[in-house]
C-alpha cells in the first residue's frame, strides 16, 4: 500500500539511471522545483537518501516523513490506498524468501510452482533461470494456427502435464531481451508479456492463485539473487480438479466483442496497440496483413511496438504505478463500472493489461482472444476503421 495521493518513485531510479532520463522521470511524476516535496519510505534511511539526492538534482524544498509508511498505516484514521489483489503481483525479495523456505506475508498455503515462461525458447531456460523454476512454453497453452487459447481438452492435458491443479499457487515470470520487431519470431524476446499471457490462460482454466513476478527475470538478476542451470522436469498430476474453463468470462470471443461494441455507454473494447497500428499505418505483425482498427474501439496504448509495453511499465520493467494506469484509462472512458475487454493482435498485450485491471479488483474484465488477427479476416462482417479517429479520447 501507500499513503493516499503519494507518487511512486523508487530510490533506485535516482542512483542507477542517467541524468537526462532521471530529469524526464521527475518531471513526468510532477516532482519539480516549484513544489514542496515530502519523501517517505519504509524507514527514515531511504527517505533521507532520496531527499538528499533530490536536493543535489536542484529540487530545493524536500522534507522527509521519517516515521515511514509503517507508522502511517498503523493509524486506521489515516488514508491508505493499495491494490485490491496486491498479493498477485510479487516482489523478487518475497519470492527469494519463499524459495528459502520462509513464510512472508501471503506465502503459498499449499502446493507451489514457479515457471520460467517464453514462446518456444527452451534453450533460454536451459542457459539459466531462477532456482526451482520449471519451463513453460506458451505453445502448450496456445494454438499455433491463430495464437488463441487451446481447447479445454488440450488445456486440461497441458496443465496436468505441468503438475498444475486448481489449488496450486503458480508464480510466472519471463525474460525480456533486445531484438528487432521485424525478425521472424520477435515474441520470443518478450518473455514478461508471455508470462502474463500464460497467467491469463491459467486463470481462465481455473487456477485459483496465479501470480506474476514483478519485473521478471531481469529484476531478479538486478536485485542480486542467484540463478541456476539445473533443468527440472514437472511431476504430472492425474486431475486438474475441475472442468476447464472454470472462468470462461476471462476471455470473450467474436460475438461478445460485438456485444461490447454495441454498448458504448456500458462497455469498452480497448485496443492495446501502438498509435501506428491504431491509425492503420502498420498491422504490427509479420504474420498479419491487414492494417487498421476495430470500428468503435477505444485506444489503450501499449508501447513502441507489438512486443513492448512501456506505457504500462516503469523504466525498470516493473508494473507502472496503478493510479497512473487507472487515470490514463479514465481519461479514455475505460472504467471499472463497465464491461471491459482488451484486445491486441492475438492476445499477448491484452493479457498484460487485463492483469493490471484484475489486480485492481475489476470484476467484469476480459481479453478478446481473437483480436485484430481474427477481426481483420472478415472486413465485410467486421467493420474496420483507419486514419485519425473522430473521438480523440485515449489512454
Regions found by a protein language model. Name each.
Residues 1-395:
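Cytosolic catalytic domains that perform sulfur/thiol-centered chemistry
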Amino acid at each position: 500500500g501507500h499513503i493516499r495521493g503519494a507518487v511512486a518513485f523508487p530510490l533506485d531510479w535516482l542512483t542507477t539511471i542517467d541524468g537526462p532520463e532521471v530529469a524526464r522521470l521527475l518531471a513526468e511524476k510532477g516532482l519539480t522545483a516549484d513544489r514542496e516535496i515530502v519523501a517517505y519510505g519504509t524507514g527514515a534511511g531511504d527517505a533521507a537518501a532520496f531527499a538528499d539526492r533530490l536536493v543535489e538534482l536542484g529540487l530545493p524544498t524536500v522534507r522527509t516523513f521519517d516515521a515511514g509508511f509503517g507508522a502511517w498505516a498503523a493509524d486506521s484514521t489515516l488514508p491508505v490506498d493499495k491494490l485490491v489483489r496486491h498479493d498477485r503481483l510479487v516482489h523478487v525479495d518475497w519470492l527469494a524468501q519463499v524459495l528459502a523456505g520462509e513464510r512472508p506475508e501471503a506465502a503459498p498455503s499449499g502446493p507451489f510452482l514457479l515457471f520460467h515462461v517464453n514462446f518456444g525458447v527452451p534453450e533460454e531456460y536451459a542457459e539459466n533461470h531462477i532456482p526451482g523454476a520449471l519451463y513453460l512454453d506458451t505453445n502448450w497453452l496456445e494454438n499455433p494456427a491463430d495464437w488463441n487459447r487451446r481447447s479445454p481438452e488440450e488445456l486440461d492435458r497441458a496443465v496436468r502435464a505441468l503438475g498444475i491443479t486448481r489449488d496450486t499457487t503458480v508464480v510466472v515470470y519471463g525474460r525480456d531481451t533486445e531484438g528487432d520487431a521485424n525478425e521472424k519470431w520477435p515474441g520470443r524476446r518478450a518473455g514478461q508479456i508471455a508470462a502474463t499471457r500464460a497467467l491469463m490462460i491459467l486463470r481462465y482454466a481455473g487456477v485459483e492463485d496465479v501470480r506474476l513476478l514483478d519485473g521478471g527475470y531481469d529484476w531478479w538478476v538486478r536485485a542480486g539473487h542467484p540463478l541456476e542451470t539445473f533443468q527440472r522436469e514437472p511431476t504430472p498430476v492425474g486431475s486438474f480438479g475441475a472442468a476447464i474453463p472454470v472462468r470462461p468470462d476471462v476471455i470473450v470471443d467474436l460475438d461478445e466483442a460485438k456485444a461490447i461494441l454495441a454498448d458504448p455507454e456500458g462497455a469498452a473494447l480497448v485496443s492495446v496497440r501502438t498509435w501506428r497500428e491504431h491509425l492503420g499505418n502498420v498491422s504490427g505483425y509479420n504474420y498479419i496483413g491487414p492494417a487498421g482498427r476495430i470500428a468503435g474501439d477505444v485506444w489503450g496504448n501499449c508501447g513502441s511496438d507489438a512486443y513492448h509495453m512501456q506505457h504500462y511499465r516503469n523504466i525498470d520493467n516493473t508494473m507502472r504505478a496503478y493510479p497512473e494506469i487507472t487515470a490514463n484509462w479514465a481519461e479514455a472512458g475505460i472504467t471499472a463500472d463497465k464491461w471491459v475487454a482488451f484486445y491486441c493482435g492475438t492476445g499477448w498485450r491484452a493479457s498484460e493489461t487485463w492483469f493490471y485491471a484484475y489486480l485492481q479488483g475489476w470484476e467484469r474484465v476480459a481479453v478478446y482472444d481473437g483480436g485484430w488477427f481474427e477481426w481483420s479476416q472478415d472486413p465485410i462482417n467486421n467493420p474496420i476503421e483507419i486514419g485519425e479517429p473522430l473521438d480523440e479520447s485515449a489512454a
